[in-house]
UniProtKB/Swiss-Prot annotation:
Coiled-coil regions listed in the entry: 41-71
Provenance organism: Schizosaccharomyces pombe (strain 972 / ATCC 24843) (Fission yeast)
Protein name: Uncharacterized protein P23A10.17
Keywords: Coiled coil, Signal
Segment forming the signal sequence: 1-22
Length: 118
């Protein structure tokens, strides 16, 4: 009978150990599943953040590009204005020279006409 108590004790111990092991495995699986779900949620959140970051980065690049374009357009516009202003000044100077030249030519024509009349 002693053997049967010992045997029962060993079987009971092994059954308890296996139940404890099974419960530990079940808890580990449950924790692992929970960690997996949390990891998936965190990964999805990171992916969403990454996409939003890329959108924001793209928008910043567009804004910088438009600022550069606007700046270059403003620079080009000011250069065109300066060029037109210079052309206008040169045109006015040319008109003044033409007027002076016209007066000189008229004076010469008058002088010649008076010389030929006498």
């Amino acid at each position: 009978m002693k053997m049967s108590y010992l045997r029962s004790g060993i079987v009971g111990f092994l059954a308890g150990a296996s139940l404890s092991y099974a419960a530990g495995v079940q808890a580990l699986i449950s924790t692992s599943k929970q960690n997996k779900d949390e990891l998936l949620t965190a990964t999805e959140a990171l992916e969403t953040d990454k996409q939003l970051y890329k959108k924001i980065e793209k928008k910043i690049e567009e804004l910088e590009s438009s600022c550069v374009k606007k700046s270059s357009w403003e620079i080009q516009e000011s250069e065109w204005k300066a060029m037109f202003q210079t052309m206008r000044v040169e045109y006015l100077e040319l008109l003044e020279k033409q007027k002076t030249l016209g007066e000189v030519l008229n004076k010469l024509v008058e002088d010649r006409q008076t010389k030929f009349q006498f």
